[in-house]
Amino acid sequence: MTKFETVRGMKDYIGIDAEKIRYLESTFRDLAIKYGYSEIITPVVEEFKLFALKGGEELRETMYVFKDKADRELSLRPEITPSVARAYIQNLQSSPKPIRLFYFGTVYRYDEPQYGRYREFRQAGIEMIGDSSILADLEVLDLLYNFYDKLNLSNDITIKINNIGIFRKIMDKYNIEDNLQEHILHLIDKNKINEALDILEKNLKNKDIIDFFNKILTKKDTKLEDIESLAELEEVSRLDIKSEFLYLFRLSRILSNLNIKFKIDLGFVRGLAYYTGLIFEVLHPSVQFSIAGGGRYDKLIELYGGLPSPAIGFAIGVERTLLVIKDLKVEEPVNVIVIGMSEDTIPSMFMVSRILRKEEYKVVINTKDQPLSKLLPYYASQGFKVAIIIGKQELEKNMITVRNLITRKQISVPLENIEDAIKQTL
């Protein structure tokens, strides 16, 4: 017989593991709604070009790509931002700005599976489209920080930030084409600094600029006052990037006032090729990889054929976030097992179950044909706290027995007093 298993790099989530994912989803959804964001659900399958156009070298290499029966080249989504951008152009472009959207869904990448890296995983994220202000950037960062605060992780995480506009402006000034810019930034992202500098040297032929690149790429933990000093350098003015440093200074100063823990890393870039300004990642000391990330992508909407529209967003790695949570306690309702002692009690079993489910109890009806002496210890071992026992004699008197399966305390009460009896036995 054929034996089927999960596809490599993908996994099943059962019981408490599934509940943890749903807990993160509901926590994120509740928070995003409180910030004024509306949910968007996009297809898992999109045109390949949607992601390939500005996904970056690494993303293109790891996409699940296939042709359908109409010979269209399609892809399982490797991320969700491009889908949101496409949906915005298709459905929301004429709506009042800014547009605030949030999502939660599965994405797919053909990576080598390892700790913290899967081929199917979940992302929770937001996109704000139509606002280029520093307030928009701060709102997005504040929402991200508050999500981790709700998970009791705000004291552990650090948000790493940079302004990729510094690199973009220099390369635009010297007419380095987009594909080469993408490759250079990809090399920097992979910490292949010397390779990136070699390509820049061949194309810029300007030692001063190469030296400047080298200087900022090595500033991994830059202080606020250093940013202000860098903004005043003559070469910064000459390269027309003073405003990019001043923006980073303003943003960082406000983040400090908001008590959001962050660090400035001028050598930090992100692998996705559509970023134009602020970029950021969430770091946790227990893992070597980021658990969330995002940034500003002011040209993507126009690239997809929409009207020019600034945008910013982030995506949270759900499984990665779960890895860094030491003790996630998902609140569960009280587990109740309803046991009927004869066929005559079946209607009462269902009636009792309906009553308790309306009061948010988790209720299971016993289907095992075994004596009570075996059923009670079995259900106690399965995590049930309360047993409702309905026997023939109780049924005749409209009574039930409520038993605490942990303490073994039990009482018999009229059916209408069932809720009080459960509370009394717990």
UniProtKB/Swiss-Prot annotation:
<keyword id="KW-0030">Aminoacyl-tRNA synthetase</keyword>
<dbReference type="GO" id="GO:0006427">
    <property type="term" value="P:histidyl-tRNA aminoacylation"/>
</dbReference>
<protein>
    <recommendedName>
        <fullName>Histidine--tRNA ligase</fullName>
        <ecNumber>6.1.1.21</ecNumber>
    </recommendedName>
</protein>
<dbReference type="InterPro" id="IPR015807">
    <property type="entry name" value="His-tRNA-ligase"/>
</dbReference>
<dbReference type="GO" id="GO:0004821">
    <property type="term" value="F:histidine-tRNA ligase activity"/>
</dbReference>
<keyword id="KW-0963">Cytoplasm</keyword>
<dbReference type="InterPro" id="IPR045864">
    <property type="entry name" value="aa-tRNA-synth_II/BPL/LPL"/>
</dbReference>
<dbReference type="InterPro" id="IPR041715">
    <property type="entry name" value="HisRS-like_core"/>
</dbReference>
<keyword id="KW-0436">Ligase</keyword>
<dbReference type="InterPro" id="IPR036621">
    <property type="entry name" value="Anticodon-bd_dom_sf"/>
</dbReference>
<keyword id="KW-0067">ATP-binding</keyword>
<dbReference type="GO" id="GO:0005737">
    <property type="term" value="C:cytoplasm"/>
</dbReference>
<dbReference type="InterPro" id="IPR006195">
    <property type="entry name" value="aa-tRNA-synth_II"/>
</dbReference>
<dbReference type="GO" id="GO:0005524">
    <property type="term" value="F:ATP binding"/>
</dbReference>
<dbReference type="InterPro" id="IPR004517">
    <property type="entry name" value="HisZ"/>
</dbReference>
<dbReference type="InterPro" id="IPR004154">
    <property type="entry name" value="Anticodon-bd"/>
</dbReference>
<comment type="similarity">
    <text>Belongs to the class-II aminoacyl-tRNA synthetase family.</text>
</comment>
<dbReference type="GO" id="GO:0000105">
    <property type="term" value="P:L-histidine biosynthetic process"/>
</dbReference>
<dbReference type="Pfam" id="PF03129">
    <property type="entry name" value="HGTP_anticodon"/>
</dbReference>
<keyword id="KW-0547">Nucleotide-binding</keyword>
<dbReference type="InterPro" id="IPR004516">
    <property type="entry name" value="HisRS/HisZ"/>
</dbReference>
<keyword id="KW-0648">Protein biosynthesis</keyword>
<dbReference type="Pfam" id="PF13393">
    <property type="entry name" value="tRNA-synt_His"/>
</dbReference>
